[in-house]
Amino acid sequence: MSGLESRGSGYAEGISSVTGIVSRTRTGELSVRATSEIKLLSPCLHPIPLTLSCEQTRSHNRTVNLLVHSAARDILRARAFVLTYLRTFFSARDFLEVQTPILSDLAGGAAARPFVTHATVLGAGPDSLSLLELRIAPELWLKRLIISGFDRVFEIGQVFRNEGIDATHNPEFTTCEFYQAFASLDDLISLTEELLSGLVKSAVEKVPAIKTNIYAKGFKFDAPFLRVDFISTLEECMGMTFPDFVLNSSEDSEDAKQFLKRLFAVEGIPIPNPGTVARMLDKLCDYYIGPILGSAKTPVILMNFPEVLSPLAKSAKADGKDYRIARRFELYVDGKELVNAYEEENSPFVQRRKFELQLRDREVDAEAHATDEGYLASMEWGLPPTGGWGIGIDRLVMLLTGAERISDVLTFGGIKGVVGQE
């Protein structure tokens, strides 16, 4: 006899075994008519509570939290379903699952502050590679594999960002990224629609915790998804037209900064710190477009970002305009970003220029992209036109299950609970 059903409330003696005949009482309770003595297999030294009402206890003793609350276990089962679905989906389309380095001398692939550590086996001299960083994204490693001749690759794994903690952010989290040679932005959108609509349909049929939440929230994942243009929507919301030198700010950054700072003052919006062009445009998006994204109960695709916001994406001249836009989209559901995807920049010359422009911002913004000379050297061997895509697994599970905190969908909770976990 084992499992939670055998342990009732109050003081439990532990996990026991018994041989007998399974039957039901007159009231329908499942029972065992013992034909042998009960044998204690493992003692329990504490009374098992009916519930844990103290939030600190729940976060710092995840073991007991999961033991007591079936709803917490249901979320982890839902997470396992999502991971299995993703692997099956990509494998069925000839994607190769790979594992790329978590430790390296330079964390790249995203704008974020990395965790830093040291490797004693590599030496501690000033010219050694003893200083290591935990990856903030697997992107640059996966694109190296595309260069190596693997046309379709994907990876599901942890990434680490030394940043703030809140209901939707944890320094350690899980992503799924894929890269496909010769895939266009339209291909990425079509695949995203197929993946998410299929995932939700299957989950509603097979995972009760997800079915209950999807119906309660009124979410609809039927394709095609709604598309929203970044620049035209922002201009409509603000009642103005941005000058080309702002949208082409990678070429005229200082003038763009001053224009945007004056605009922030007029609009009464606090200037982000640091006040780079990318940060300010991103802030305007959150302020004006964010409410539009948050009001929809269907997936919304935000696309045609200014070039400066996407240093790793291929860019092109906007139709009928004199500014350039990134071949990129983000997908939002209920105001929360789930997917980031774009056509990858595959020119080593253009990529170096974009890295160098980001390096100027790095003087005031520690999270700006650093120049990865190793990746640039790999690009010299020829990166074919490639589409790249990433989704946050934790946020996806939160959305599907209705979990309010990212710690609820992590096996042992967020970092605050992991540190000092009982």
Task: State each model region's role.
Residues M1-E422:
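Class II aminoacyl-tRNA synthetase catalytic cores and aaRS-like
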